[in-house]
């Protein structure tokens, strides 16, 4: 097969590993910067050009679309779909997962465990908003934030009011969520491929840090999932319509709590922590499921 890997940086660990895994499995592979693609929207023959040449002959693509290029990146993925090329994660599913509010609404509809969350436009009822999530301490989260950026722990009522009003004063869209204290600054990242958890790690935040992101100094170790945690991760990926997903779970007193479903999960941390070859699992999944025109939208909402 001929596989395109949509990534802006060929030197990134995840991009490199996917490229190498495809080559090892006997496929042709090419890394394509989606921002350098340009497309012709035509009813009879849609095309994509890249650096002056038309891209042809691809059987499948692996989108590695960063949050900062979601709009254009998903447009490129959608154009490949219009050309009957299989995408391991579809454009609509990527867009769905990038909208934190939409994701939470879809997951809640299906009964997935979530943190108590509020969303509001006005700061007029901030006190009641805070009460709705159980009061301080609470977490204020930018809708557009990634890798722990734009996530603030407000430990008191006064601090919570100040943070919410400050973000709103900057015209930012925010979520207000309960703080799951019993998680102890740790979460579980489950890597789901084709409806199965192929690897899982526990990430512990640095001392004094409630965010567990490895980018912020968190430490990763292999973890054994409970059946409920495994089922929650698989169901969450399915609800979002993602074949490949990183599902972030907190362990709470009321069971697994899903914090995020990521459509372009990094591979370095989880492969290093678990010793699992996740890139190989993704290529094997593509081998089994690639068919021309197989771009039926998965998930709803």
Swiss-Prot record:
ATP binds at residues 141, 178-179, 187, 211-213. Mn(2+) 2 binds at residues 260, 262. Its EC number is 6.3.2.-. PROSITE patterns: ATP_GRASP. Mg(2+) 2 binds at residues 260, 262. Binds 2 magnesium or manganese ions per subunit. Its cofactor is Mg(2+); Mn(2+). Mg(2+) 1 binds at residues 248, 260. InterPro entries: ATP-grasp, ATP-grasp_RimK-type, ATP_grasp_subdomain_1, RimK, Rimk_N, Rp_bS6_RimK/Lys_biosynth_LsyX. It holds the Pfam family Rimk_N. Mn(2+) 1 binds at residues 248, 260. One of its GO terms (molecular function) is metal ion binding. GO terms for cellular component: cytoplasm. GO terms for biological process: protein modification process; SOS response; translation. Keywords: ATP-binding, Ligase, Magnesium, Manganese, Metal-binding, Nucleotide-binding, Protein biosynthesis. Belongs to the RimK family. PANTHER family: RIBOSOMAL PROTEIN BS6--L-GLUTAMATE LIGASE (PTHR21621:SF7), RIBOSOMAL PROTEIN S6 MODIFICATION PROTEIN (PTHR21621). This is Probable alpha-L-glutamate ligase. It comes from Syntrophotalea carbinolica (strain DSM 2380 / NBRC 103641 / GraBd1) (Pelobacter carbinolicus).
């Amino acid at each position: 097969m001929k596989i395109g890997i949509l990534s802006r940086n060929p030197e990134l660990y995840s991009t490199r590993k996917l490229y190498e895994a495809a080559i090892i499995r006997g496929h042709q592979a090419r890394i394509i910067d989606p921002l350098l693609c340009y497309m012709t929207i035509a009813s009879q023959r849609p095309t994509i050009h890249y650096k002056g040449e038309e891209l042809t002959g691809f059987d499948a693509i692996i989108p590695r679309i960063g949050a900062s290029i979601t709009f254009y990146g998903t447009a490129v993925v959608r154009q490949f779909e219009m050309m009957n090329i299989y995408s391991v994660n579809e454009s609509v599913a990527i867009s769905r997962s990038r909208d934190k509010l939409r994701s939470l609404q879809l997951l809640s509809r299906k009964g997935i465990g979530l943190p108590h969350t509020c969303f509001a436009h006005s700061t007029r009822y901030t006190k009641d908003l805070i009460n709705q999530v159980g009061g301080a301490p609470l977490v204020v989260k930018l809708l557009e934030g990634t890798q722990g950026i734009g996530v603030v722990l407000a430990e008191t009522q006064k601090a919570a009011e100040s943070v919410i009003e400050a973000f709103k004063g900057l015209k930012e869209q925010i979520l207000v969520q309960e703080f799951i204290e019993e998680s102890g600054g740790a979460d579980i990242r489950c890597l789901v491929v084709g409806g199965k958890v192929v690897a899982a790690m526990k990430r512990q935040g640095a001392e004094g840090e409630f965010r567990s992101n490895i980018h912020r100094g968190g430490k990763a170790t292999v973890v054994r999932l409970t059946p409920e945690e495994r089922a929650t991760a698989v169901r969450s990926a399915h609800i979002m319509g993602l074949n490949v997903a990183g599902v972030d779970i907190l362990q709470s007193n009321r069971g697994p709590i899903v914090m995020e479903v990521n459509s372009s999960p990094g591979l370095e941390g989880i492969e290093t922590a678990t010793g699992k070859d996740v890139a190989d699992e993704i290529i094997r999944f593509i081998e089994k499921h690639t068919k021309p025109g197989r771009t039926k939208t998965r998930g709803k909402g």
